[in-house]
Amino acid sequence: MVPTYSYSPTCVEIQPGSTMDILFPVTQDKKKTVWISKTYPWADGWFAGGMTSNGEVTADVVYAGFGVTAPELGYDDYKDIDVKGKIVLVEGETPNISRNPDSLAMWYKHTLHQTKLNNAAAHGAAGLLYKWVPGPNAPYNPGFVYCHVTDTVVNDIFRGTGKTYKETIRQIYKTQKPASFHTGKRAHIKMNATYNPNATGKNILGMIKGSDPILCNEYVIISAHLDHLGMIPFLIEGANDNNSSSAAMLGVAEALAKSK
């Protein structure tokens, strides 16, 4: 049997008018500070967060490393730094460089988008600049705006701080200690987004019942997705990711059906 069924994922539709700017302080007459804004083009500078809230925020930018709070691992990017009402700049993944399976398992939950975004919101951040490519499994936090940023934006934020991004991240990996700091920059994030908690998607399910009287009650699931990531910001070739996998899955299904 090959039934088609619907499901209801949550989604956010990004509308025209969304923007992201970095504001740089310039001191005039040794007394007055004015803020000069630099607007970054979509794709070259930023991408909207997949589950961003609708809204607009301007706030100081705090670099918060990997955005991880892991007391069980003795690591906290938010320790001794106030991000309430601020916009945090965070990395994807974690500072863990070990390939040991046990170590990877302990750090795993801190690699997830939802963990990082929820953690930033829990610390009172008003928004987030995410130095990582868009991906699934992000949570929706009402009133919390975020976007993904490229190296161009990150390097501009670090400029004039006495630090470089490359050396800062290298030291975190080397010492396994946070290096969070106030950057002295501000960011303006405007997301024109519509949240839809009841979007409709469709899947196709095919099932071949097993012949063993005992094992027929157990299942092996083979799956693939047809959707394509597009530009993130580099091109993901849709013919390969993930249509080649979808074609392989259909080939496996045909072979199994014929061998029954």
Predicted regions and their residues:
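Noncatalytic luminal/extracellular "stalk/propeptide" segments of secretory-pathway proteins
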Residues: 1-97, 185, 200-201
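A conserved hydrophobic secondary-structure block that centers on an alpha-helix together
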Residues: 64-138
